[in-house]
Amino acid sequence: MISIYAKPPFLRVNEATGDSYVCRVSSRIRGEEISEYMGTKYNAEERAVDDLCIFIKPRSLNSIEDGDYVDVLDGIELIPMLKERPGVKVIAMSQVHYEYLKNELKNEIYLIHHHHINFERFRRTKNDILAGGMIGHSPEAYNTYNQIKESLAPVGIEFLGAFNYKTRQDMIDFFKKIDFFVAWWGDYDRTGFYNHPTKIINPASFGIPALTQPFIGGYKEFDGFYIPIEDMNSLVEEAVKLKDDSYYQIWSDKVFQEAEKYHISQIAELYKQLK
């Protein structure tokens, strides 16, 4: 049986705003949610001889045996340890992540993407007044949100933010309110090996197109399924185009269908293939 081990998520207070937000979300996504959906063990006190063990971003490899799996995520500190333990198997979370790890490690590497949050396959219908939205919890996110909201107001487009979300349901409730999503990266490093497209696949699973600055490799598996922007002017231009119902429907259908590849039922099949 699959047995997943992960450190629990926790809340951290944003000193700039006083709000709390969830850290270590990967434990909930690739630990709790996958375990509950598949009926696997989760943080079991004892391991059986025939358990297939997956450790999500562990601090060390001390308790990990050859043949176990390590889900690296953004744990760059694990790479030197894994080089010393080629018998430990590795899980990558995106295509660019997989390619990087393949180049760095001699270990067996398996690609398993994040599943999206829309287990129920809920489909959005467009608001009468177009509304966009973004998520985040950094001080920069608040500043960006205000800039985008002010830029869209003159063209009659509403803009909402979700900064204090803590549960999957919080995110579902948010996505049910918006027609398009903005992933604004600004000066953020878009070349990192640990980048992945989940941030734009989540809204896509509701039929919500994303406007975003392209990642170098990080969006590789979702290329062609988001609307590229470069600056605030292009963001406004592309958002205005989405007012057209026919144009919007083309994008909504396109991204909704592609996001099905990342439904939890599809991702669970990849876990079942591990040996």
Regions found by a protein language model. Give the residues of each.
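N-terminal pre-catalytic "stem/leader" segment of glycosyltransferase-like enzymes
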Residues: 1-66, 100-101, 217-218, 224-229, ...
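Short beta-strand elements of ligand-binding domains
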Residues: 56, 68-75, 111-112, 211-213
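Donor nucleotide-sugar binding/catalytic pocket of nucleotide-sugar-dependent glycosyltransferases
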Residues: 89-100, 106-121
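Conserved catalytic-core segment of nucleotide-activated headgroup transferases in glycan assembly
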Residues: 13-34, 114-177, 200
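Membrane-proximal helix-turn-helix segments that form the acceptor-binding/catalytic region
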Residues: 72-90, 104
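A charged, aromatic-enriched C-terminal amphipathic alpha-helix characteristic of glycosyltransferases
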Residues: 29, 119, 230-234, 243-275
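Nucleotide-sugar-dependent
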Residues: 168-169, 181-205, 212-222
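Alpha-helix C-terminal capping/helix-to-coil transition sites in glycosyltransferase folds
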Residues: 48-50, 86, 176-177
